Amino acid sequence: MDACRALTLNDIPRMVEINEQGLPGTGKVSHQEMADLLGLSELALGLDNERGLAGFVLCLLPGTRYGSLNYAWFNQRLEQFLYVDRVAVADEARNGGIGSLLYQSVIAHAHRLDCPVTAEVSLRPPNPGSVRFHARHGFDEIGVFETGQKAVTMYIRKEK
């Protein structure tokens, strides 16, 4: 497996495919929405294996023109942060450490920026695997945000 690399517009079809495999936890997006997210991202990294792109992460800084209510929740409460909008790993590559490698790069980037990392995890519908993943990577719960039928747990990872 190679090191993390910068994502490009050529990666969008595979990113959408991987994202679809993570539903409902990742949230559905079109090819255009994924391209828009890529353009807004402070950090957009992918990891390849022998089959090509195996996982990716997209992160945003505060004050970005992005319509996510979850992102807005952090914007209203924190001045500085690196927001993980989505991290997704292909079905065939899960449990192989790709998510952890991507998060190591996210955490290192946040350290360089001297800011915490933020993310949300679906509470309704539940995503227990993501809860465990974020706990393993040093994230703490800082709130719950509910919108209609959905609810998410808000997480932050500060430098220890």
Give the role of each language-model region.
Residues 110-123:
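Conserved GNAT acetyl-CoA-binding A-motif
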Residues 144-160:
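C-terminal "cap" of GNAT-fold acetyltransferases
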Residues 89, 95-108, 136:
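Conserved acetyl-CoA-binding loop-helix of GNAT-fold acetyltransferases
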Residues 2-15:
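A short beta-loop-alpha structural element at the N-terminal edge
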Residues 24-50, 64:
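Active-site rim helix/loop that mediates acceptor-substrate recognition in acyltransferases
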Residues 124-143:
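Conserved active-site alpha-helix within GNAT-family acetyltransferase domains
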Residues 58-86:
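Conserved acyl-donor/pantetheine-binding loop and adjacent beta-alpha core of acyl/acetyltransferases
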Residues 85-94, 123-124:
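A short, internal acetyl-CoA/4′-phosphopantetheine-binding micro-motif in the GNAT/acyltransferase core
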